[in-house]
Amino acid sequence: MDLASRKIVGWSMSERMKADLVCEALKSAYWRRKPAAGLIMHSDRGSQYAGESHRQLIKDYRMIQSMSTRGNCWDNAAMESFFKTLKVERVHQLRYQTRAQAKLDIVNWIEGFYNQRRMHSSIGYQTPVDAERSLMAA
């Protein structure tokens, strides 16, 4: 997530939460955005984020790693809020027949609804795409 616009810029899905999952999500975000060196990559303190493969990828991309304070859920509140929204507004509303169907639907929801049409109070009741445009124009 781009914290300034709340736009979801990279993701990956898997049956298990492993280091390669978060590395794939970071690669997705990196290649879509191609950020300048020094971008802060924030996460919780999960073992996948603290692992060598993820730390090395952050170093290779010349990013700065930031991790939540131990026991402080507020440090990663924006992502926690996104996952709650995804579950409540989409995933728990449907019954998927296959994992492939679920993945396709979730990607379509992120790209077609969440980033494009869902307004957020934290960015002045704009959509993430509109907030990003406003930030780029400033």
Predicted features, each with a name:
Residues M1-A138:
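Charged DNA-binding/catalytic regions of mobile-element recombinases
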